[in-house]
Amino acid sequence: MKAEIHPDYHTIKVVMTDGTEYLTRSTWGKDGDTMNLDIDSKSHPAWTGGSQQILDRGGRVSRFQKKFSGFLKKG
């Protein structure tokens, strides 16, 4: 293997949407950084059976729906 080509692998803290925290190893950020999740297994409809709404951060979903609202309409 070539030396010096792999990213630094270090410990970070992950904070889930309900406030639960855990430590894991990652190449994201720097050693000791905190990653705050917007969506996780406790809030994503794929794991909750669709009972939760996904938070539309920054209006991305709204812009997408507006842009493609008439895409499949017959006319």
From Swiss-Prot:
Part of the 50S ribosomal subunit. It comes from Nitrobacter winogradskyi (strain ATCC 25391 / DSM 10237 / CIP 104748 / NCIMB 11846 / Nb-255). GO terms for cellular component: ribonucleoprotein complex; ribosome. It comes from the Bacteria. HAMAP family: Ribosomal_bL31_1. GO terms for molecular function: rRNA binding; structural constituent of ribosome. This is Large ribosomal subunit protein bL31. The keyword rRNA-binding applies. The keyword Nucleotide-binding does not apply. Keywords: Ribonucleoprotein, Ribosomal protein, RNA-binding, rRNA-binding. Binds the 23S rRNA. InterPro entries: Ribosomal_bL28/bL31-like_sf (IPR034704), Ribosomal_bL31 (IPR002150), Ribosomal_bL31_A (IPR027491), Ribosomal_bL31_sf (IPR042105). Belongs to the bacterial ribosomal protein bL31 family. Type A subfamily. GO terms for biological process: translation.
